[in-house]
Amino acid sequence: MLKSQEVRKLAPEMDPLRMGMGWKEEDLTKPQILIESTYGQSHPGSAHLLNLAQKASRGAYEAGGKGALYFATDICDGMAQGHDGINYSLPSRDIIADLVEIHANATTFDGGVFLASCDKSVPALLMAIGRINIPAVFVTGGVMDAGPDLLTLEQIGKYSAMYERGEITEEQFTYYKHHACPSCGACSFMGTASTMQIMAESLGLMLPGTALMPATCEDLSVAAEEAGKTAVALAKKGMKASDIVTLKSFENAIMVHAAISGSTNTLMHLPAIAHEFGIPLDADTFDRMHRGAHYLLNIRPAGEWPAQYFYYAGGVPRIMEEIKDHLHLDVMTVTGKTLGENLEDLKKNGFYEKCDTYLNKTGLKRTDIIRSFDDPIGTNGAIAILRGNIAPDGAVVKHSAVPKEMHKALLKARPFNCEEDAIHAILTHQIQPGDAVIIRYEGPRGSGMPEMFYTTEAISSDPELSASIALLTDGRFSGASKGPAIGHISPEAAQGGPIALIEENDLIEIDIPHRILRVVGINGEKCSEEEVQRVFNERRKALAPFKSRYTHGVLKRFTQTAHSPMQGGYMD
């Protein structure tokens, strides 16, 4: 018997309450499907999800189920940038997961369709799926169109820094702002939103080929309706999310992450999702699997083209076809078939021919967007975990976005205790080539772990600094960030991590090939490892205990309980 029918016997009020919303008597006995989305007029990534949720509900009804629409509206990192709102970004992931858990368990459901588009909402719903463990199908809200001259939102940070330096006029800057987001959908670059949409499909929780579709494409509505039908089929079979998502699924997702040069935020989101499924996963797994992996995707910010072309080039299935010798093809998916079977079906049903038809209209070839395995952009993945006396527990760098001349560097420390001071120093030319800008007390326990997006844009948009300095932080970066940026430094400063002990003009060694990040000199003079440790010990005695400025609310709870970003940065 379906779980919803068992609960009906225990809660006689349930039937009349549902009929009060217009349900018919026959609806009460059908498989009950939770249609959970992050719809809201909060940003373009969620504003269109109501329509897709309704399509999913229709699909469930046509398959003999009954859908119920629930909402957990997310926030937009882009709207939170540049002020204290960004401190709520990572905590919002965990709060949304909590709300979905409440929705799913307070009223019993037999299955669910989960719809989201963006940075924190996709991992939030994936975390919730692992936690509630019901038959589940994910639908992502796709990607927005690019603007005139293929303008995309991640370029606005660059133009903002150029405007601040007087390099473009106010009229030019206004034009860029008014044309960067011409439609609904996730931002059209391979940032965290696009990456996490791809991760959802790579885990086996989406219908094949449906991640990162153009939001304006009718195919997306069809996919949402099919997801509703699939959720009913899974509910009738009793196939739970944990029957699909395994350690092998996460390893597949990490291999896809390497192939697309995905966002560094994935190194927090996938471990947090795995935690909810009861599967151990840490950042070192990314480092191991990225080594020697072929990087294939020519999409911004590291590549040339907007993300709307990803689907037209064949999407996740095309990436998987290219790297299939490095994937677990025997993993189960929501189709009830294995990954290998899904890939074979797509070849037979004309999926790739349809995609080629779309792409040919742009004058591009598939290999302009997704390179072949034998002709990759790079052959060592995209991500590395660095360690040393600055980051004993690790730090993350997206080396595919770092200029080659900065893969090994010796720099002078310029520490700042907040991002605002660092940005001011960069924009007023106080930072010089050979400096290492260090931003600390911005980790999960410090300020909620905001993104350092404007700092990276100020650096990467400056021709003199972009290949001559580095940014080190216990905070994190936007998926749009590029350049020599090392984040997630752990332990963080707020917990007494060594990053809190660095002083002006200490010498910082960065060695990405050998995975090293350490202080090798004091006050501009190189010295032994033992001498550095002796100085650190003396500085620690004078280090004042960190005192959080958050005395109530969400940020107090998050900064008191959040785990290390190396473990997923999730809140207990």
Language model features with spans:
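Well-ordered mid-protein domain cores that form the structural environment of catalytic cofactors
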Residues: S89-R93, A97
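A short, small-residue-rich loop immediately preceding and capping a beta-strand
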Residues: A104-L125, A136-T140
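Catalytic or ion-coupling anion/metal-binding cores of large enzyme and transporter domains
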Residues: M1-G45, L52-T73, G78-M79, D84-S89, ...
